[in-house]
Amino acid sequence: MLRVARALVVHELLERTRDRWVLVISLVFASLASAVSLYARSADAAAAHLAGPSLVTLISLVVPLVALVLGHDAVVGERERNTLGLLLSLPVGKLEVVLAKFLGRALALSVAVGLGLGAALAIAPAAERAVMMALVFPTLKLGVAFLSIGVLVSAVARRQITAASMAVTLWFLFVFFYDLGLLGLLVVTDGGVSQQTIAGLVCANPAGLYRVEMMTLFAGPDGLKNLGLAVPLPSAALSAGIWAAWIALPPVISGLLLRFEKAKR
């Protein structure tokens, strides 16, 4: 069983590294990250310190999209190719199949993130390299969380075009509209919602939690207070729990959905 699961992981990794859309988006990410590093290298010392926050903004936009694109066809793609039944007939459980596909794609995503940040790191000024290296693990957490969401979308959708539409919609929702919705909530309630509630809702979104953690990294624990937001940040244990939930729950739910679908037939 372990040998079959390992073969599935390797197969997914090789297939995704040959996916032209993933390659294109990864190259775009690497190019944009390199452009940020080039700007930091050519700018004065004061402007060079903006390279890290600029890279965080870029990552919070591009990496979730790459991850959702990478995960959106994990299950539904097999269904449309009529190979899902063959895949589920292997001597591994439904959950193990989903986890193997998820892990293989997570490795491919790690390669894409590594290439993008590696390109930026290679041409970054020496003073900014430590900061950029500190972005690697949080960026991988962000990407894997959205990859998990993409895998769940793939298990729910019945057609690949539907899964792609859902993935793009979720990207807009998590990256753009979520924060706008919270801002609208503050406006509608005339500030009646407490800052603690808003902070909790922001950190419940993986993209928002990533931005908050990176703001703390660059500005220190008092960074939000300096912006007039005197709210308690989630503890390290709570942040780890939020990340673990976003990363682990969607693939598990996907495996359960496959098991339920198989049982109905």
Placement of each model-derived feature along the sequence:
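Aromatic- and glycine-rich beta-strand/loop motifs that create alpha-glucan
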Residues: 1-26, 258-264
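Residue-level recognition of transmembrane alpha-helices
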Residues: 26, 101-102, 135, 139, ...
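Secretory targeting signals
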Residues: 35-38, 45, 52, 59, ...
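Helix-loop-helix units of permease transmembrane domains in multi-pass membrane transporters
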Residues: 74-106
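Terminal transmembrane helical anchor/hairpin motif
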Residues: 176-248, 252-253
